[in-house]
Amino acid sequence: DHLLPQQTRGRDEHQPAMPWRQLPLFVATSVYTDEPYNVTRALLLMVILTATRSGEARGMRWAEIDFHKRVWTIPAERMKARLQHRVPLSRQAIYILENIRGLHDELVFPSPRKQQILSDMVLTSFLRKKKAVSDIPGRVATAHGFRSTFR
């Protein structure tokens, strides 16, 4: 019933996660858009499609993406565990990236005004605004919570 195995080590505080059965409707009604480019929505879709931490996705650089092999290689210095991580990119993830390719030189999802890494509050604000349902009553889902949606 889960895509990824449960973690075996002790956990820190649980982040509110969206129940996986509700994810397709949420994406279809609140995230997916026909807009040519909306940095927040594109970033959230990438977080969901890759099950990566939002900080890893916010810091994604074009040089890390191999379109031919459909792999995103996150350097060790940007990973929590300090080990290089290779993320396979689905057809949908490649589609998002191809639609925004060439818009920015280095960062894939830069802040529109400053061309630097987006604040971690961008996704939090979006999810609050959309009242993203979570597995914790009275709390909205968090970007980090999407990682546990796949466990």
Region roles according to the model:
Residues 63-71, 138-140, 144:
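Short, polar N-cap/turn motifs at the start of nucleic acid-interacting alpha helices
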Residues 64-66, 89-92, 147:
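Active/binding-pocket-proximal capping segment
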Residues 1-14, 94-128, 132-138:
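Major-groove DNA-contacting interfaces characterized by cationic-aromatic clusters
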Residues 75, 90, 110:
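Residue-level detector of conserved, well-ordered beta-strand and adjacent loop positions
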Residues 1-60, 68, 79-83, 102-103, ...:
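Basic, Lys/Arg- and aromatic-enriched nucleic-acid-binding interface segment
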Residues 71, 84-88:
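Well-ordered beta-strand positions in beta-sheet-rich domains
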Residues 28-41, 50, 87, 99-107, ...:
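Short, basic (Lys/Arg/His-rich) helix/loop patches that form interaction surfaces
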